[in-house]
Amino acid sequence: INTFESNKEFVLNTLDISRFMRLRKEIKKYNPDYLYIPMIHLWNPIVNFMAKGAKIITTIHDITQHKGEESFIMDSLRKIVLKQSDKIIILSESLREKLVYQKVKSENIFVIPHANFTYYGENFDIEKKDYNNKRILFFGRINAYKGLDVLLEAMKIVVKENTDIKLSIVGNGDIKPYEEQIRELGNNIESNVRWIKDEEVEGFFMQSDFVVVPYIEASQSGVIPLSYSFGLPVIASKIGGIPEQVIDRETGYLVEPNNVVDLAEMILGLGSSESKRKELGKNAYTFAKEKLSWEGSAKLFDKLVKSI
């Protein structure tokens, strides 16, 4: 049953009562013992109500809205879903305390880390990975909390010492707040600000040497396991659940959020050592394969279901 791909479709489909009648019919036909919600959706309260008798398991990606994404509706929706859920899955241990503060019992909270994205590069060979592209990558939705402005300020320091390094900005979002910084950096910046198709993802990572995740707030980041899946080390902010994903000096480096100078130094350091990029990149790839496998996630999920 299709939900929506735009705000217009959401309004139209939400007002389409027949769609919910079909949904109710399907739920009644399956008569599920468990209902799994992989992410918060505006239809969740309705679906949860329809699945009376089923144990509800919900994955919560963020406890509060990020900077620039504040929404009273989403905050209220999250509170409703938390009350309806029997078990909550979080992607990092850092969120547990915040959920407990919102009256969720700790024994009903389970951590299942964000798994890898090796399926984006099924033919990827870590032994053939080129770490001499002289290009670093900022990947994903462009939002205020992701710290792109901090990275661009750091790049102003970086290019004074290493004019060969380029930053690729790849992802969908509003680039206007950063246009002046980008102009100042000239040819050291490459931008692909648009929706990136699945089949394009591999190319951007393959032509990069490492990834920077300069978030100023975060619960965790899906970009990190994605980067590891292509053998790329990550320089990331030491915030939220990110230190659970980036093992400092093993799979990348951690820096304090909003610290332009430290971020620039880390970029210059990693950017000047191909051997270090290769070492950390191989560690990251191994970490993704061994610690962030979908098989491992499935076992943890199975254990959770059996605990209800």
Which stretches of residues belong to each language-model region?
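A short, well-ordered alpha-helix in the C-terminal region of glycosyltransferases
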Residues: D262, G269, K276-K291, S297-K303
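Conserved acidic donor-binding segment of nucleotide-sugar-dependent glycosyltransferases
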Residues: D248-R249, Y253-V260, G269-E274
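An aromatic- and histidine-rich active-site surface loop
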Residues: R19-L23, P32-G53
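Acidic donor-binding loop of glycosyltransferase active sites
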Residues: M206-S219, L232
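Conserved donor-binding/catalytic core segment of Leloir-type glycosyltransferases
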Residues: K129-K146, L152-M155, L167-V170
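Short hydrophobic beta-strand element within catalytic cores of glycosyltransferases
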Residues: P233-A236, V246
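Acidic anion/phosphate-binding donor-loop and adjacent secondary structure
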Residues: E69, V100-Y101, F110-N133, I308
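Nucleotide-activated donor-binding/catalytic signature segment of Leloir-type glycosyltransferases, i.e.
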Residues: E179-E202
